[in-house]
Amino acid sequence: MNKTVDRPKDRIIRSQHVKLGTKNKMGQTYTDINTMFFEVEREPSFMTGSEVIRQAVKVASVGTSVAYPITPQSEAAALIGELYAEGYLEEYFRGESEFAVMGQCAGAAFGGHRVFTTTAGPGTLRAMENFPMWAGSRLPIQVCVTMRGINSPLSIQPDTLEAHYLLETGMLMWHAETAQDLYDFILKGFIVAEQPDVHIPIATMCDGFFVTHTKDTVMLPPGDLCLPPYDPYKSPVPCMDMECPPVRMMRDPFVMKSNYISYSTHASWQQEVRAAVERSRKHTIHLLDGLIDVHNIDRDIIIVASGTAVSQSREAIRLLEEEGIKVGLVKIKTIRPFPHEEIKEATKRAKHIFVPEFNLAGWLAREIKAIVPNNERVIAGPHVAGGMTLPCEVIVEEMKKYLGLEVAHNQ
């Protein structure tokens, strides 16, 4: 098991926009984040991932949510609309398209609201131009990406390929294994993204249907508590003021003045966005108890995975151990920032590192191969795509084939 990290209470800068202990208009009490995340007693609830998204938004003091329906996030977007009808959000409306939604989210964030939206698959790709714009504008918007197939022929089923496209947008990227992860990541994601030394958008990702439409037991804090709201005055860049825009780039591109100014501006700002991702590490480690979880990493064979591939790997490991094959596990929680040093340390003894994924590109295996010494140890796969499940028996069979072990005919 992992060693619990120290959690000094002054590590995270919280909003001082409201006084803790006071109530919002819905009667929820603004609660210290350390108390809400680590101290209050939680009660079990049995619900789908979409319902979990609703519950998280209900206590997150979200100001604006913009929606556009696309499976498998449509239900979550509709449930957030119910929260608006009940009075928990200040603004909620449906955009004209996924591209429009992300632009409208930017406007709300420029105006100082905490902003949450959801998307999936082709919607993510249609909205893609906005994500690096969010990052470059230092907008701490949260988008919940309920990942699904993006290829033709059309598939609405789970596939994590869209995460590959998001890797270089400048956003934080956290990948939830379970509905519990998803709930916690949504709430903690706001806090990390809004830190003054970070202040960039975050994609909280989960595997569509496997998480969004499957019921699971989730431990929830009391619904009469809520996070302190976003404090736009903690932003490292000026808030948007429609009477006095903070910078002329909104109306007058740098390239109109000088190519050199344009080049140097973009180069330095891209470096700053990436530096902000790196600065998020200390806050993320504090709130998520590390960027990875590890189990039995002293073994010669290790599986490294993220999302629901972790769940399938756990059962595959159990089956392998019944045959006397001992395998360790590394669960990756954050894709950006990527846990470079943690993975190198966790896999340093391994002779074989398997990376099962719900996509054919093998983007996670590529990330791992790029950082570990002797990367011939990294075996990309097994892979499934387009909504195929990844049975634990398939993981077992493919691992045994690679290791030159006998494969049972009934597998």
Which residue stretches match the model-derived regions?
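Thiamine diphosphate
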Residues: P8-A179, L187, D207, E376, ...
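Glycine-/acidic-rich phosphate or pyrophosphate-binding loops and their flanking alpha/beta elements
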Residues: T48-I53, E278-I301, R314, R318
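Short gly/pro/ser/thr-enriched loop/turn and capping motifs at secondary-structure boundaries
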Residues: G123-R126, R148-S152, D181-L182, F210-T212, ...
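A general structural motif
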Residues: L154-I156, V273-D289, V304-Q312, I332-P339
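Structural signature of the thiamine diphosphate
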Residues: M173-V237, H352, P356-F358, V394-Q411
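Conformationally flexible catalytic loops at phosphate/diphosphate-handling active centers
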Residues: P201-D293
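Generic long, charged, amphipathic alpha-helical segments
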Residues: A316-A346
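Peripheral docking tails and interdomain loops at the edges
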Residues: P356-Q411
